[in-house]
């Protein structure tokens, strides 16, 4: 596929104006963020599929109408050495699909460090796979309450905006705390690559394309693009699309998907009002949560107060080689008993950043003989095993996984090949349909929820297929 601009449509939606083939291919640095990006495209009217392994011709043949292909990954919690080993092959396989934009999809809170989930390292690897001479970066996503102004990232919680280094959750992230909101400075710790900015004032100017062309060079600089509102969102999408040339690599949040969709919509290439169908209610759902977020903690508390059965996974026991299997058995038994009575269940490892399971996690891991990272993955595998056994023992049609690492572990254990969007719930956490060669898993309805997504009624909303109380 080349970089020529599709013909200007005459009126309404004009699908024939699209260039042939894929429009975008992306690798998500965690599973929940990958579904967020898929939702943004699908809701806008761009058929999208999310693969949970490298996309093969055989798998993609099941989705002949797609214009966007994603692959869910786990690099946000990985070392730079892991990235050096794993990302080149993955990104090469996505680049080979021929889309003009290859994206490394990052979280809209940009949580990363030189040691863990290095976005800079991912960029240095990714730019080798596309011919472009700049690497745009779109992080702001107003729909998710993320805003970038003059290179600084802000996020709103409960109607209050915070600079990211003062955000009540991200500034205290247990692995990658954000202590710098200026993304130029934060990213400069992770790469020696030149970093530039198109700020919100330049973006609205008449000569912004000239400015981009002046920045383009063989060293392929990273160019951050401010996004504050719907106007700057659409302008960012226009800039990326019109300056894609023969193909570009970008490390961006789902703000990129929202930006491209806004531009395409403005040109009449997409329906004027983005939407997804609603879902039907189910009697009961099962959820597992490895999230430490106060947002998820509030959601667990709401669910408990509204008739859900909540069961804590005891981490010292779960990590102990002698007690781990028994702890999983205990949790599964309690959860199964509730589900057979038609009661929804949440199995969780923590409730918020001040939970002793979080504040004392290093000591718990050390006592079990694990480094922090290895212990965290073992907890994710324990939650995945709980979900697998619940699905094998109870008739369940809809499940939830909260937390990016947990989502990856669960999807792997369940043998899911791909996901597509079934229905809309809240921005960033759609209801998905699982595609699997395993008949018992094919058609499973699943929600993968990031820690910061949703209000307190989230689990009730998933069960009802709509906002609780609506």
UniProtKB/Swiss-Prot annotation:
Chain sites annotated for binding ATP: 291, 403-406, 451
Keyword Magnesium: no
Entry EC number(s): 2.7.1.231
A Pfam family this chain is assigned to: NBD_C
Pathway involvement of the protein, from the record: Carbohydrate metabolism
InterPro entries in UniProt: 4-carb_acid_sugar_kinase_N, 4-carb_acid_sugar_kinase_N_sf, NBD_C, NBD_C_sf, OiaK
Keywords recorded for this protein, A-Z: ATP-binding, Carbohydrate metabolism, Kinase, Nucleotide-binding, Transferase
Enzyme class, first EC level, given as a word: transferase
Catalysed reaction equations from the record: 3-oxoisoapionate + ATP = 3-oxoisoapionate 4-phosphate + ADP + H(+)
Matches recorded under Gene3D superfamilies: Four-carbon acid sugar kinase, nucleotide binding domain, Putative sugar-binding, N-terminal domain
GO molecular function, one term: kinase activity
Function: Involved in catabolism of D-apiose. Catalyzes the phosphorylation of 3-oxo-isoapionate to 3-oxo-isoapionate 4-phosphate.
Name this polypeptide is given: 3-oxo-isoapionate kinase
Organism expressing this protein natively: Paraburkholderia graminis (strain ATCC 700544 / DSM 17151 / LMG 18924 / NCIMB 13744 / C4D1M)
Gene name of the record: oiaK
């Amino acid at each position: 596929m080349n970089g020529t601009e599709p013909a200007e449509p005459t009126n309404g939606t004009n699908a024939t104006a699209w260039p042939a083939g894929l429009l975008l291919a992306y690798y998500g640095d965690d599973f929940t963020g990958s579904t967020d990006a898929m939702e943004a495209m699908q809701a806008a009217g761009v058929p999208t599929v999310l693969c949970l392994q490298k996309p093969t011709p055989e798998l993609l043949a099941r989705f002949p109408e797609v214009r966007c292909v994603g692959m869910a990954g786990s690099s946000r919690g990985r070392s730079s050495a892991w990235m050096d080993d794993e990302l080149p092959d993955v990104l090469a396989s996505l680049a080979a699909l021929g889309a003009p934009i290859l994206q490394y999809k990052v979280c809209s809170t940009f949580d990363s460090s030189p040691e863990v989930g290095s976005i800079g390292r991912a960029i240095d690897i990714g730019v080798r796979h596309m011919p472009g001479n700049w690497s745009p970066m779109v992080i702001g996503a107003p729909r998710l309450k993320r805003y970038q102004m003059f290179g600084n990232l802000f996020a709103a919680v409960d109607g209050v905006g915070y600079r990211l280094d003062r955000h009540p959750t991200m500034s205290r992230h247990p692995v990658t705390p954000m202590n710098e909101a200026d993304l130029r400075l934060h990213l400069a710790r992770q790469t020696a690559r030149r970093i530039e900015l198109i700020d919100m004032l330049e973006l609205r100017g008449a000569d912004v394309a000239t400015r981009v062309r002046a920045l383009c060079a063989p060293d392929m600089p990273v160019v951050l693009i401010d996004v504050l509102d719907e106007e700057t969102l659409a302008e960012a999408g226009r800039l990326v699309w019109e300056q894609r040339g023969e193909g570009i690599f970008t490390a961006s949040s789902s703000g990129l998907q929202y930006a491209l969709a806004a531009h395409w919509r403005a040109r009449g290439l997409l329906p004027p009002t983005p939407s997804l169908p609603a879902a039907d209610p189910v009697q009961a759902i099962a959820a597992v949560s490895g999230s430490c977020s106060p947002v998820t903690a509030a959601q667990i508390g709401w669910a408990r107060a509204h008739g859900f059965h909540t069961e804590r996974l005891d981490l010292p026991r779960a990590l102990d080689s002698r007690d781990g299997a028994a702890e999983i058995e205990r949790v599964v038994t309690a959860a199964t008993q509730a589900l057979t009575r038609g009661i929804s269940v949440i199995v969780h490892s923590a409730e918020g950043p001040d939970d002793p399971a979080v504040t004392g996690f290093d000591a718990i891991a050390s006592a079990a003989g694990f480094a922090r990272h290895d212990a965290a993955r073992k907890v994710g595998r324990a939650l995945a095993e709980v979900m697998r056994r619940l699905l094998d023992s109870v008739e369940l049609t809809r499940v939830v996984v909260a937390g990016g690492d947990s989502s990856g572990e669960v999807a792997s254990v369940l043998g899911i090949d791909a996901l597509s969007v079934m229905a809309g719930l809240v921005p960033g956490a759609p209801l998905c349909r699982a595609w699997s060669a395993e008949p018992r898993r094919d058609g499973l309805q699943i929600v993968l929820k990031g820690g910061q997504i949703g209000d307190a009624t989230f689990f009730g909303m998933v069960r009802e297929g709509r906002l609780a109380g609506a």
